[in-house]
Amino acid sequence: MLTIQKFGGSSLADVEKLHRAAQLCVRERERGRDVVMVVSAMGGATDELLALAYSVSAAPGERELDALMSTGECASAALCAIALEAQGQRAISLAGWQSGIFTDTEHGEARIQTLTAGRIRSALAHGIVPVVSGFQGIDRYGDVTTLGRGGSDTTAVALAAALRAEGCDIYTDVAGIYTADPRLVPSARLLDAADTRDMLRLSYAGAQVLHAVSLETALEKGVELRLRSSDGVGEGTLVRLLGEGERPPLAGLALSRGRITLVGREAGSALAEMRACLAARGIECLGGAEGKENAFVEVARGDAQRALGALHAHFFAEAK
């Protein structure tokens, strides 16, 4: 059995967290599973590299910017491989180009076109854990490209599909996926399972947990994801294509600036109820619309968090 483990920047922010990520990998290996790790740049590293580039030039070239930005993930991969070796697990760090990740030529927003993964397969065959630099690949000219925001998630999903992995675990600093951002709505509920289509709509609406391109890839390739905490506690949230009998009527709420979007198979007819909920609490609704399986309202930014909390209490109360 093969598992893809993807670790975000906040899960690799310091030496202690690097070792914790390595421990999670070793634990899977002790259960008899092969593992491919995919890593983001350490927390803050990408912003530091970007600031450095713009301190040198007000308009750095796209090619060189990609070459620079990709080094953050490469550093993380090397450090994770070192941490694994320190725990007795053989490992090898691989940049995107070494992993056989071929993209188009759109620097900064490249899309994966083919994935050969020859060196990854070879490492796995020899009991070695490949630690792959996420967020990057190589184009037909041999130039390094980056995949844009959320690119490491996309790398993990693409590898899961190409290698036919049994699982793709996305480790973050939260316990899983909630009915709303728990930082804004403390009463938000952790979901055991979520539908890939619903998560994609929430991502389009501004939810920050999983990026849209990775979810599009998961939907296209039939990859199941599990979003879980990097502290290793709990089972997190399984994201897959749910049957109609399994799908909840409402999946969650997303906030982007002053727009609050409700997503779910019954959300498309909820606009009037959303407006009424806000009106009952004295919150002015500035606009809104309904879609097939979503509806949104617009409020003043100063009212946004209070409106989000009110809508969550209305639609996701325990009695509902």
Model-found features: residue ranges?
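Glycine-rich beta-alpha junction loops
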Residues: 42, 174-176, 221, 229-234, ...
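Conserved NTP-handling cores and scaffolds of large molecular machines
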Residues: 163, 206, 222, 282, ...
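Nucleotide/pyrophosphate-binding catalytic subdomain
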Residues: 1-215, 288-291, 295-303
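A conserved active-site cap/scaffold subdomain adjacent to cofactor or substrate pockets
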Residues: 202-240
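A conserved regulatory-domain signal marking ACT and ACT-like small-molecule sensing domains
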Residues: 236-320
